Amino acid sequence: VKYKDLNGDGQIDEKDVRDIGYPKYPLYTAGMNMGFSWKGFDFSMTWAGAFKTSRLLSSMYRVPFGESNNSAVMKYMIEDAWTPEKGNSAKAPALSFKSKSHNYQDSDLWLRDASYVRLKNIEVGYSFPSSLLKKAHIGSLRIFMSGYNLLTFDSFKVSDPESDPSGTAYPLIKVVNVGLKVGF
């Protein structure tokens, strides 16, 4: 990894440090709810998104490129690592067993866009007509299927864009429910 002499004094030091990226908390958030019902069928969904937000990958994502070789290597680290064939098109430093502690210092190399759009909730259901339920002495009957966090569009790819960038938190789980609601 090469660092740029931003102030032009011929030295790479703390005077070359600059703010990079966007804040951890997004500058813009958005959400949208929609739904409809027709002849007993119903459908609803909720979308949410965050924009102009960045994550600086924590040491867990950088250590394999430095001097500590006791960490697992993730798929992106191998695919994106520098090789003579890739040259300047590589997105990550060369993997090495030698001391390369400068490879995991804070820099825009480890900065990722954490903007995303996520399908937070989707539900499809059917309510049976009361004329069919009277004989069974049932007031209402609805079957449904719902899902949470099933789809996310983002360029972060390393972990969940909503989770803590330290890599120590579980990502949001995907949930699918099937249900039956009976009223008497």
Where on the chain are the PLM-derived regions?
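Outer-membrane beta-barrel transmembrane strand signature
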Residues: 1-46, 91-114, 118-121, 125-133
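Surface-exposed loop/turn segments flanking beta-strands in extracellular/periplasmic regions
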Residues: 7-10, 64-75, 163-169
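Outer-membrane beta-barrel domain signature
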Residues: 17, 30, 48-55, 59-67, ...
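Strand-connecting loop/turn motifs
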Residues: 38-41, 131, 138-140, 173-175
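Transmembrane beta-strands of outer-membrane beta-barrel pores
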Residues: 38-40, 49-53, 121, 128, ...
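Membrane-embedded beta-strand positions of outer-membrane beta-barrel proteins
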Residues: 45, 143-145, 180
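Extracytoplasmic gating/loop element in the C-terminal half of outer-membrane beta-barrel translocons
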Residues: 50-142
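C-terminal beta-signal and terminal closure region of outer-membrane beta-barrel proteins
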Residues: 81-91, 104, 150-184
